Amino acid sequence: RRNKRGPVSLSDVQANAVSRYDLHDPELNRVLGGGLVPGSLILLGGEPGIGKSTLLLQTLLRLTDRKVLYISGEESEQQIKLRADRLAPSASGNNCLLLCETNLERIFEQLRDVSPDLLIIDSIQTMATETIDSAPGSLSQIRTCAAEFLKYAKSSATPVLLVGHITKDGA
């Protein structure tokens, strides 16, 4: 939602106290300023293999009070389940829904049906929309898909966590 009135003084803005999502991890909550803000989009970036997916899976297994949709464009349901069992053998995972999909339009069909409390996209480089004629991972695909996830986060007040891979040259 854009302000159609023009610029306003920061001191005139009324800020309501926002209830953040407690991630049940003191350090992660601290890094995020006290937890996840509803409607926010967080990019978790780093080189491939450093543990971004593992960190997010470990986090969502702690969130027994939230419905989490974990969308993977890189791993199968079985691979994710094996890693989850290794990380938290006693966790039920009942709050976690898995979707192995890379097509943006099909993902949004599922989002309308599921309405998660938290959305995890692993990774943004694997996502693609049919509206752009380029390969997944191209700059135009990444920008467009990330913009659509941001719109979803803002319109639904759902926090979205995006995994992004950074190559050795920083791309």
Task: Label each PLM-derived region with a short phrase.
Residues 17-20, 45, 92-101, 128-143:
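Flexible beta-alpha connector loops of hexameric P-loop NTPases
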Residues 2-90, 108, 112:
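The Walker A/P-loop phosphate-binding site
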Residues 109-121:
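Proline-aspartate-enriched helix->loop->beta-strand connector
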Residues 48-50, 74-78, 86, 102-106, ...:
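Conserved nucleotide-binding/hydrolysis micro-motifs of P-loop NTPases
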Residues 1-2, 161:
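Non-catalytic accessory segments flanking P-loop/AAA+ NTPase cores
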Residues 67, 94-95, 115-118, 155-162:
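Loop/turn-to-beta-strand initiation segments
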Residues 140-165:
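Substrate-engagement module of ASCE P-loop NTPases
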Residues 28-31, 44, 80, 122, ...:
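Conserved RecA-like P-loop NTPase ATPase core
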